[in-house]
Amino acid sequence: MAVAECPVPMTHGADIRADSTWFSRTQRTPDVLIEFERFDGTDRGQKKLDEKLCNLLEASMRWGDAPSVLILSAWNKGVVSAPNKEVFVQRCRQGFKSSVGAQVPPLRNTAVLFSRFIFEIECSGTLLLKQMRCERLL
């Protein structure tokens, strides 16, 4: 069962809502958390993706590390440079301190996937999905 913009438990003050949360019907806990973000190939775009990853990591912690899979999904129109995935891997392996001072630990038993959707703008102005890529970061 999936929920969009699902709030995570409030344990450290900041409101976090995963873009998509997939729940186990039997356990009634989240199995998969997903964040989506447009990526424009800039440093600012890289920072936005990192912020989305931090949301995933903190949301997982707040759910008691229940999710078995976290997915960071980036999409773009046209050709842009690829994001630096090593930054994401290090964030997952090292953890971080949240904006409210909560320590988010490194991931232990959670898979992290990075997916990309590359769209092309057609002459009619519509978008056409040209490529999809998905790889496991952890």
Where are each of the predicted segments found?
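Alpha-helix termini
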Residues: S24-Q27, S60-A66, F96-P105
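Active-site metal-binding core of divalent-cation-utilizing nuclease and nuclease-like domains
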Residues: M1-R28
